[in-house]
């Protein structure tokens, strides 16, 4: 297991794009220490910020967190990364495979553009978790994003495929959603599914619902029971939510209107 131990408070935001087990596996500790990660004129390197210990394995642990650690696990294609603490924005951006775990909380845009693998945030996530960054065509695009705490506004904005689990979420969850599944065990904020084209949003409760969502009854759908079984190892609270009778709403009828929102009946 390779480790990066944070030396202290960060003087600026740092960009950890491509700081992955695969990228570090062919480098010596001295070579890794020269990798540029700064975002200002200071020219910070990996060695300036972290004490580095490499063993060539496919497992990397970052000891110590900071809200200034941006793009942790971005472009991860194999192996695992574990962060003991908080991280900044764009956690796991463009991740293709592997496992990425944060023991603290994450900033905005966690999981944006991630096509595979599993991202687990044991704390809270900022706005636009699983959402699209500016000018991007899609947010989460096939990966699994698990948020054990609360997610901010616009959870899953322009999500294209994959799955998001969360404890609760703010306003505009599943906004502009293209496809995929979001299960929130607790409450949603106002206007869930704004501009939703397709996809499935399941929640314990919701705030103000858009007038462009219409109730379609309480169907007994096989896929909901199958989804509950598949979620048991990822989120017990989310799986439990699916075991009861759910009321279905269809929308957003102001767009394509093939999305669906389920809440307990």
Curated annotation (Swiss-Prot):
GO molecular function, one term: transition metal ion binding
Cellular location(s): Cytoplasm
Pfam families with a match to the protein in the record: GXGXG (PF01493)
Ligase recorded as keyword: no
Record-linked InterPro entries: Formylmethanofuran_DH_suC, Glu_synth_asu_C, Glu_synth_asu_C_sf
Keywords linked to the UniProt accession: Cytoplasm, One-carbon metabolism
Involved pathway(s): One-carbon metabolism; formaldehyde degradation; formate from formaldehyde (H(4)MPT route): step 4/5
GO terms under cellular component: cytoplasm
Biological processes, Gene Ontology terms: formaldehyde catabolic process; methanogenesis; one-carbon metabolic process
Segment forming the signal sequence: none
PANTHER family in UniProt: TUNGSTEN FORMYLMETHANOFURAN DEHYDROGENASE, SUBUNIT C (FWDC), TUNGSTEN-CONTAINING FORMYLMETHANOFURAN DEHYDROGENASE 2 SUBUNIT C
Note, other: Although FhcB and FhcC do not possess a formylMFR dehydrogenase (Fmd) activity and have an unknown function, they are required for the stability of the complex.
Binding partners and assembly: Octaheteromer. Part of the formyltransferase/hydrolase complex fhc; composed of FhcA, FhcB, FhcC and FhcD.
Family: Belongs to the FwdC/FmdC family.
Role: Involved in the transformation of 5-formyl tetrahydromethanopterin (5-formyl-H(4)MPT) to methanofuran (MFR) and formate via the formylmethanofuran (formyl-MFR).
Record protein name field: Formyltransferase/hydrolase complex Fhc subunit C
Lineage: Bacteria, Pseudomonadati, Pseudomonadota, Alphaproteobacteria, Hyphomicrobiales
